[in-house]
Amino acid sequence: MAKQEDSFKKIVSHAKEYGFVFPSSDIYDGLGAVYDYGQLGVEMKNNIKRYWWESMTLLHENIVGIDSAIFMHPTIWKASGHVDAFNDPLIDNRDSKKRYRADVLIEDEMAKFDDKIEKEVAKAAKRFGESFDAELFKSTNPRVQEIAQKREELHTRFAKAMNDNDLAELKQIILDYEIVDPISGTKNWTDVRQFNLMFKTEMGSTSEGAMNVYLRPETAQGIFVNFLNVQKTCRMRIPFGIAQIGKAFRNEIVARQFIFRMREFEQMEMQFFVRPGEELDWFAKWKETRLKWHKALGMGDHKYRYHDHDKLAHYANAATDIEFEMPFGFKEVEGIHSRTNFDLSQHEKYSGKKIQYFDPEMNQSYTPYVIETSIGVDRMFLSVLCSSYEEEKLENGETRVVLHLPKQLAPVKVAVMPLVRKDGLPDKAREIMNMLKFDYACQYDEKDSIGKRYRRQDAIGTPFCVTVDHQTLEDNTVTIRHRDSMAQERISISELAGIIDSEVSLKNLLKSLV
């Protein structure tokens, strides 16, 4: 665990050092759980969003996009249930004066059982060597079975408390399992209570006439209240979807783990409207489709898993998370939910407007059911960063820091470098860069030795480096260096675009999804 924490600290430091992510308001010592994306971070973030957007709106004829406002009529949040039910169970430690989410404390305790099991497996693997069967060992070893049973007992009790909204039981679990404050090391806990996560502000020119409004805690409601607008103007027929990328805001008390949990974040959400009774079939299809989208990036299939919800949200009849293995454990990067017809029915009730769809095939009107896919851009960004960072030991004894980013998401696709800053090489390098820059994000670099320049590009995840030397002036060939293998080959300038495109093209990645 300590090794993983150390690794995560290095990733966070690397992100700031190379211009991926900065603490917001840094010169004023920052603002808790708020971050800015730097010059490389914004490019990679935009590439992630483009991959998602095009996978939704280009690959599906029945999915269109919108961009709804952050401020919306306050009654929307009453209708959606956020005013009454958008809460976290919080608990304070009297000694450290720190506040925690009770459910997270218990989930962390469950993770300790998982860690114990993995340690037993690792010890056995060393003992038995290549013939070791991890799954068989887990299912037969008495020590592992004992740990697994204790975990299951905790999980069952925790799931019931969450489903029953039993705050007293959540505290009792914390006491019974002797969960201590990570700072003070004590068990001096307050009672658990609910805390609403929405930011409230006022809209209006005078305080007397001002209206209370909220910063949206999710983008989904902007889609639901525009259901009729989109359906009618685009003549959409069910099943169809509406996609949106936008900022959301939550007053997270326990914001932590860098950009994983923030107070201002960005979501990519798609609401897919279906016939009542067909929602669970579509739920299963979108589970499969979304996992395929993640795995297509090549960050390791073993790093993903589904996690079905122990407690369903007030609007759902099925829900699962796609979790990714971060340095601090498996964590949610995307949620897929069957939201039933709750949202549209609620908005019909509170607005007084009929929100239904007339199905010509069934010759009847109904309130559609909804399948939601919701992915956090920032969490996706972090998963890419964490899976890509490596301190690689080279044969000569040196260490290079490299980001093995999915090449389609890399902020810079190709760096163009003159070997020396004379003899016309910079002019030739500029000519090549001007040829490539209309299709690929390029960087020109002529400072320091070629080796140092290669290391700089490795550290920001640039897939290709193109070096212009004296031979280039004679035969129009260049050296192209591949980031991951560090292999170099001599090619004609006319071959450059084809080689680069075959590796970094978003089109090829999208084709793999079809």
Task: Report the location of each language-model feature.
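NTP/phosphate- and nucleic-acid-binding module
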Residues: 1-514
